[in-house]
Amino acid sequence: MPNVLSAQQIEHFHSQGFLEAIPVLSQGEVEHYRGCLESFERMYPNDVKKLKSKSHILCPWVADIARNENILDVYEDLIGPNILCYSMAFRIKDPDGKTFAGWHQDGAANPIKPILVIGALALADCSLAHGCLKVIPGSHKKGVLQHTDTGNPDSILSRGQFISTEFDESKAVNLELKAGEIGLFNAGIIHSSPVNTSDERRLVLLVEMIPTHT
């Protein structure tokens, strides 16, 4: 029996490649973890970039998020009870109207089989103005498309990569989140995120999980 997701939600994730906002953290938890992040930034300003990959190894409080029962229940409904944390990666956008992610597939860099499920966990409200994720429904079934590296320093992606094959962007869905909500997607889905045009930071933690039989 599913823990928290309905049969319709589970079917939607596997057929469309994503799920929209699911509440997993209380307001108190959000404030606590946001405080932990801000404390780290103050104490180790030169190490903030290390939070962009496998931050659960560096910070015990990030590992606590990875073990959160509400979050794990969601993943269990999608990939079963035997779960391995692949990575916890912060994707922070300052309100400078510069940082973005072009259209890409995470599966191009991490071709994990049978599945890598990525959750965008919001530690602050994340609307389109903040630069929320945009996904192309069902595109995880297309296979990995051709990507081109640009090295653009304004890209939130490691190589400034983007999909150089044509696809229909008009089908994009915005994954807007309230603080404490998580939106999930298959690593193979085509997705992007625009610049942050708000006056607040976008604070998103990517929660990347795989089944242990991967």
Predicted regions and their residues:
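A short beta-loop-beta micro-motif enriched in histidine and acidic residues
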Residues: 104-116, 170-171, 177-178, 200-201
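Residues that flank catalytic or metal-binding motifs in active/ligand-binding sites
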Residues: 58, 86, 115-117, 129-131, ...
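Short, conserved beta-strand element in jelly-roll/cupin
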Residues: 111-128, 176-179, 184, 207-211
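Double-stranded beta-helix
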Residues: 128-194
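Active-site region of the double-stranded beta-helix
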Residues: 81, 105-112, 121-132, 138-140, ...
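Non-heme Fe(II)-dependent double-stranded beta-helix
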Residues: 1-112, 147-148
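Non-heme Fe(II)/2-oxoglutarate
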Residues: 39-43, 74, 182-184, 188-214
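Short, solvent-exposed loop/turn segments at secondary-structure junctions
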Residues: 26-27, 91-93, 108, 126-128, ...
